[in-house]
Amino acid sequence: MGDKYIGLAKKSDDITSAIELVKKVFDENNKKENFIFPQESLKLKNIVIVKIDDNIVATCLIHNRLLYFKGKKIPSAFLCFICVDKKMRGKGISKELMNFTIKICKKNKVELSFVIARKAVDYYYSKFSFFGFSNYPKILIKTSPKPTKTGLIFLKLKNSLINEIMDIYNNTHEKLIGAFHRDFINWKFIIKKGKTKGVNLNIIKDNDSTIGYICFKGVDIYEIALNEKKYYPLVLNKFLMDEKVNRINLHMGINHPVSKNLDNFDYTFSFRKCWYGGHMIRLNYNKEKFKILLNKKIQNNILTDEIFNIPLLDQL
């Protein structure tokens, strides 16, 4: 093996080569997938590379976020697009890549690191003190819509409208353990990602006043946040009417405000947990602070201490 460098990207060519490697590794079947990357992750300080003889053979992108946890914003990071060139596997390179990436996170005072792991590699990340905390809460609504006249309208969410919903989103999600704070830049990326996933992001207005937003695909609603609880049944009923359906899958749990405003609906809660992988987390500092995570398997009141599942459009 030739000269080796393990560290942060140093020049723009490193960024280009790292992206090319990601596309090569993650699109092995040549499906021409539409890869999108948060701009913040494409900075030199957020790209870890392994070079051998000046060729990048492994990389990991760091995407910094703020996690809501017990009313506080916790410095966190997604470790994403982790990959090693197929020709260089089995040589210990992935271990070096992960160890250096974790070192950078700790140096930057990142308290929690996340990976969204493919099932085939769940076991691997556990070697670096990651553990699974995947939750899949769902509220199934089976109700025929009730014809009602309201001033509610759904409009496509555009960058120019982001400021109208940022506070509504954050005020709702700051109380949900596991949700992430979103600023304008985060929202711009989420709108872009939604398009690639075929997910609809709509701002909701009551006459001329913005009351919140909704994120959905088919009958699956992945996110909803409204500025007043009275609007939840009205918005859900409008969704049923507009989509001409009699059921909705709400991908959220009992701690979300929508769950307290379903009196006029036939609904069922379901709650699936997956401890071995999927959404995985590493506690870099202050483990005492995160007892709710460390003791996840033995909680007596597990629904009260529910960890909110990472929203689809925040996953990287």
Annotate each predicted stretch with a short phrase.
Residues F131-A225, K229-K230:
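Amide-forming acyltransferase catalytic core, primarily the GNAT-like/NAT-type
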Residues V84, G90-K103, E228-M241:
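Conserved acetyl-CoA-binding loop-helix of GNAT-fold acetyltransferases
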Residues M98, K103-A117, E243-I254:
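Conserved GNAT acetyl-CoA-binding A-motif
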Residues I47-I49, F114, L201-I203:
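Residue-level detector of beta-strand face positions
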Residues M1-N64, G71-F78, K146-F184, V219, ...:
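Short amphipathic alpha-helix that is part of the acyltransferase structural core
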Residues R65, I82, R118-V121, F130:
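An acidic- and aromatic-residue-enriched active-site/binding cleft used to recognize and process polar
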Residues D122-T148, Y222-L316:
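Active-site/acyl-donor-binding loops of N-acyltransferases
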